[in-house]
Amino acid sequence: DLDIVQITFRFWYLLATDIHRALEQGNPAALPFRDVFEQLFAVILRHLRFPDDDTDLTGQERDDFRSFRHYMGDTLKDCCYVLGAEACLARSLEVIESALAQASPELRWQDMEAPLFSMRSMGGQVDVTTSEVVPRVFALVPRLPPHPRLRYAGLLVMSRYTEWVADHPEHLSGILTFITTGFDGSDRDIAAAAAQAMDFLCQDCREHLVPYFDQLMHFFRSVHATLAVDDLLSVSEALAHVVTAMPPAAATEALVQLAQPLLENVHEVCELPSATKPDLMRAADRMEQLA
């Protein structure tokens, strides 16, 4: 009963705080509780799993479950507090690696999406500068089966660990390619996840992405007319982050390039003999990007 599960969340938070303090003080009485939190971690992964068939869920039930998963993500952080974030991240990764190795016909996307969600939830706890697991995460995500829910979850995982890419720029090209392919299809959720990942990547790796600006602009010109408003804003902000890492003269020229496609859209609407409401809304959206 998920309603009962939620009642325990504060208990686990308080217990994790006390156990963490005791472990830091070298109290041997706290050691057995590590096993308890390892069991808790496994239970949470099971509860994070979407039902095999969620088509029978009402919209409210689906929203409630998503909200519940985010609360469960907070309890995962309690597990990190006791077991260590690196160890917890490795556990989630091993679940997916094991599933991929078996390649069973009975394997469902839900079996891999739940540990992916847990990786995303734990992102703020992991020291990406020293992690030995994060490189394995970035190697794994592009190898996931091409299911839209896994693609969506994988992009959001990448968006949580872009600080690692800043310390390992040799991986930047492959990661950038993976993120940009998230805009190729018609799935709005995947495009939104790709836009978020692009924003975080450009924010954390702005200096390394300066040589890629022409490539980024080519990509921007190819997608800006089809993106949803919020996604266009995220991608515009992403490229603006890169511009801030340029010398003043180069930044001025780059800003002109970035603004040009948006200004062209506004100009097209202004030239219409009788602009419709959607036309005016599109022009207003482009002006918001410019602001």
Identify the residue ranges that each predicted region occupies.
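Karyopherin-beta/Importin-beta family HEAT-repeat alpha-solenoid scaffold
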Residues: 1-291
